[in-house]
């Protein structure tokens, strides 16, 4: 166990600067275009950078199949998410949620953004990614628990991807401007993308925690779940949508807030 913890710590020594480089580059882009919601695009790419830096730091350790799966899963999730968000946000004004976050800034808004948005998200990201660090050095073969984790990852990835695709298609029709999306997966949960993120990260945790000391990374998916359900995900978005989307309050009354469930009649 002590060996696992020392390897995880060693991997973080590589993952931290790799993630900071991505954050600083993204911050410079945000400064250049006066648009700090670009940090959303950083999220997936920074996880990829952290995962590969950690893998580099722990070469020769851990089960090779688990290492390969974790890197593959983080890569396809991160690339899809960052690509989708970059395309979605291109040409749009800054997300009002980030404008509100930056409103207390005294002096340079850009330096305030670096501290409050980019560096804070970097710390959160490194913490949320701890299951990956533990999983990369786990020696045991993938068994039943890991298999359940793989299934959860694909269920979550499918929910997130399909939900985003359905929303993008809905918004592509001019006649839907200002309307509430309540079709497809959005009929069963107000946030299929957040539910997907929640599910796939619990899946990654199970893959990583099946053997050895990976169970110590349990606070990471709990923290991620709290962010999505109680803090920066669902609550902030719904507060904004209730003010900007007529009919969203009715949508809330009939549609499950997070976990998929048939709508109320």
Enumerate the predicted regions with their spans.
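Hydrophobic transmembrane alpha-helices
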Residues: 9-23, 46-81, 85, 120, ...
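Short, strongly hydrophobic alpha-helical membrane anchors
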Residues: 1-9
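Helix-loop junctions on the outward
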Residues: 32-38, 58-63
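C-terminal ends of transmembrane helices
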Residues: 24-35, 83-88
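Juxtamembrane helix-capping/reentrant segments at transmembrane boundaries
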Residues: 33-49, 93-116, 179-186
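Broad structural signal for hydrophobic residues in well-ordered alpha-helices, predominantly aliphatic
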Residues: 28-29, 101, 241, 251
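Hydrophobic alpha-helical segments and helix pairs
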Residues: 81-134
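A broad structural signal for alpha-helix termini and local helix breaks/kinks
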Residues: 32-33, 105, 245, 255
């Amino acid at each position: 166990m002590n060996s696992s913890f020392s390897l995880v710590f060693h991997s973080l020594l590589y993952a931290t600067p790799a993630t900071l480089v991505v954050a600083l580059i993204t911050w410079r882009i945000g400064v250049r275009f006066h648009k700090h919601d670009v940090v959303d695009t950083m999220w997936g790419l920074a996880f990829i950078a952290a995962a590969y830096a950690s893998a580099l730091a722990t070469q020769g350790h851990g089960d090779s199949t688990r290492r390969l799966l974790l890197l593959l899963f983080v890569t396809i999730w991160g690339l899809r998410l960052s690509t989708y968000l970059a395309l979605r946000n291109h040409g749009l004004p800054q997300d009002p949620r980030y404008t509100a976050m930056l409103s207390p800034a005294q002096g340079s808004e850009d330096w305030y953004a670096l501290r409050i948005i980019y560096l804070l998200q970097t710390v959160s990201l490194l913490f949320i990614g701890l299951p990956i660090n533990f999983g990369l050095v786990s020696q045991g073969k993938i068994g039943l628990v890991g298999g359940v984790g793989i299934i959860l990852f694909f269920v979550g990835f499918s929910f997130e991807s399909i939900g985003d695709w359905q929303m993008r298609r809905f918004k592509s029709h001019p006649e839907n401007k200002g309307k509430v999306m309540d079709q497809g997966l959005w009929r069963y949960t107000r946030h299929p993308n957040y539910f997907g993120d929640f599910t796939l990260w619990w899946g990654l945790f199970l893959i990583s925690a099946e053997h050895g000391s990976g169970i110590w990374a349990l606070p990471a998916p709990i923290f991620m779940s709290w962010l999505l359900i109680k803090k920066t995900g669902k609550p902030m978005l719904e507060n904004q949508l209730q003010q900007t989307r007529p009919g969203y309050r009715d949508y809330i009354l009939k549609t499950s807030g997070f976990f998929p469930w048939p709508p109320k009649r």
